[in-house]
Design a protein with these regions (language model features):
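Phosphate/diphosphate-binding loops
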Residues: 1-36, 131-155, 160, 183-189, ...
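Short Gly/Thr/Asp-enriched flexible loops that form oxyanion-binding sites at enzyme active sites
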Residues: 6-13, 99, 161-180, 215-218
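Cysteine protease catalytic core and zymogen-processing segment of caspase-like enzymes
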Residues: 20-21, 167-193
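Gly/Ser/Thr-enriched, mixed-charge loops and adjacent short helices
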Residues: 8-145
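Catalytic-loop motifs flanking and including active-site residues across diverse enzymes
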Residues: 24, 95, 178-185, 211-215, ...
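Phosphate-binding and adjacent anionic-ligand microenvironments
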Residues: 146, 150-152, 156, 172, ...
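Gly/Ser/Thr-rich loops at beta-strand to alpha-helix junctions
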Residues: 3, 90-96, 160-162, 210-213, ...
Length: 428
């Protein structure tokens, strides 16, 4: 995925193309646990497996059908994208062919691929941490940009489900966060589909609980219902599947998570950097034709809805003592929940492990209908928020911070203070 070369693993998907949900994953794991990995594993050679139909090659017909599905999700098909100049890096991964193919199909032909990162290489020699969320992954592309001076830099992670972007900002290049791009894409998709007359009745967008609340304001403006789900794109995929069961999948317009995952269609049930790259190119070209950059557009959203800013901090707690420390932090927060954070009264706290949302102002408890998860959320009277959860894959406890202000300066100050207060609250 987007981890260093030393990491190993796999993702398990169901017949609907969505990662296995909690119940299905537990069932599969129970079957796996019954298998003796030394005696019960059946083996065969590759060619025999192909002959027996146990392994199937994905043909061009499937690939072309996939590309057609992505193309059908364009929201500004009349936008002239031909003049767009793009630098792209697949970060030694699988994105090179599909991303370049889809960009070519919509007319983006001036694409320069970072040469030293073009071919797949699981050792990731030029990007030890091939994650488009961090600036280091863009270093080769940024060097190339000094000569080419593109309108847009795109970087997809090795399995091509996340995409990061950078655009010119005076003499430098500004990298956008996943929340920035998620808000921009949601507004772009909703505004263009409304203008095109293709916005469905009672549209639905989906985001994870740790993603920016700016999207709620944007969705409300277009009469779009915004659904919150637990962290992990499989929960966004599950929402599409539930809509499909009711014959209402056309209501889904967009889904995203702050960790650079986006999906603008229902043809798959996971984040997809191919469609995201297409929509981003459309968006940059559309606003360029209006004389705007994404910096201008994002600032316009802030001025209209409020300066919603987000950040996160992780604290590493290794070994058994670290696990106990994380457990102790979560227990203490549940036993003695804060009533005030950063000088602002906590008006609501959500505990996804007990499935209880508590309105501290009115003293009312409401049931959380999402699956149980070890997550605690605190919402303050000024609109700021603090969310705490242990990492599911690393020996870390994570803290997600959100602030909102009438100016960038006031929101940035609030976010910085909130980070300090949150760090002390967790005991670090």
């Amino acid at each position: 995925s987007h981890n260093p070369a030393k990491y190993n693993g796999y993702k398990a998907y169901g017949p609907d193309g969505c990662q296995l949900g909690l119940e299905a994953a537990d069932y599969v794991l129970s079957i796996m646990n019954k298998v003796d990995i030394f005696d019960d594993v059946k083996t065969t050679d590759f060619e025999n497996a192909v002959k027996e139909g146990k392994i199937e090659y994905i043909g061009d017909d499937i690939i072309n059908e996939y590309l057609d599905c992505v193309m059908a999700c364009r929201v500004a098909p009349n936008t002239d994208v031909g003049a767009l100049k793009v630098i792209y890096t697949p970060l030694h991964g699988s994105g090179n062919k599909p991303v370049r193919k889809i960009l070519s199909k919509i007319g983006v032909t001036n694409v320069t691929v970072v040469p030293e990162q073009e071919k797949p290489n699981g050792n990731f020699p030029t990007a030890p941490y091939p994650n488009p969320e961090i600036r280091q992954a863009f270093e080769c592309a940024l060097k190339l940009a000094k000569d080419i001076k593109p309108d847009l830099l795109l970087a997809t992670d090795p399995d091509c489900d996340r995409v990061g972007i950078a655009i010119p900002d005076k003499d430098e290049y500004k990298l956008f966060s996943g929340n920035d791009v998620g808000a921009l894409l949601l507004d772009f998709v909703l505004s263009r589909r409304k203008a095109n007359g293709t916005l469905p009745k009672d549209p639905i967008a989906v985001k994870t609980i740790v993603s920016t609340e700016l999207c709620r304001k944007i969705a409300d403006n277009y009469g779009c219902k915004l659904i919150d789900v637990l962290t992990g794109f499989k929960f966004i995929g599950e929402q599409i599947t539930e809509l499909e069961k009711k014959g209402e999948e056309n209501r889904y317009v967009f889904g995203f998570e702050e960790s650079y995952g986006y999906l603008g269609g229902t043809y798959v049930r996971d984040k997809d950097a191919v469609i995201a790259s297409m929509l981003i190119c459309e968006m940059v070209a559309f606003y360029k034709a209006e004389g705007k950059s994404l910096i201008d557009v994002l600032d316009g959203l802030y001025k209209k809805y409020g300066y919603y800013l987000c950040s996160q901090k992780s604290f590493t707690c290794e070994g058994e003592s670290g696990m106990n420390k994380i457990k102790g932090i979560m227990t203490e927060l549940r036993t003695n929940p804060p009533t005030e954070i950063n000088g602002h009264k906590v008006v609501k706290r959500d505990d996804y492990d007990t499935s209880v949302s508590y309105d501290t102002v009115n003293g009312v408890e409401n049931k959380i209908t999402l699956p149980k998860s070890n997550v605690l959320c605190y919402y303050m009277e000024d609109g700021s928020s603090l969310i705490v959860r242990p990492s599911g894959t690393e020996p870390k406890i994570k803290m997600y911070l959100g602030s909102v202000g009438k100016t960038m300066e006031s929101s940035e100050k609030e976010l910085s203070l909130l980070a300090d207060v949150g760090t002390k609250l967790l005991g670090f």
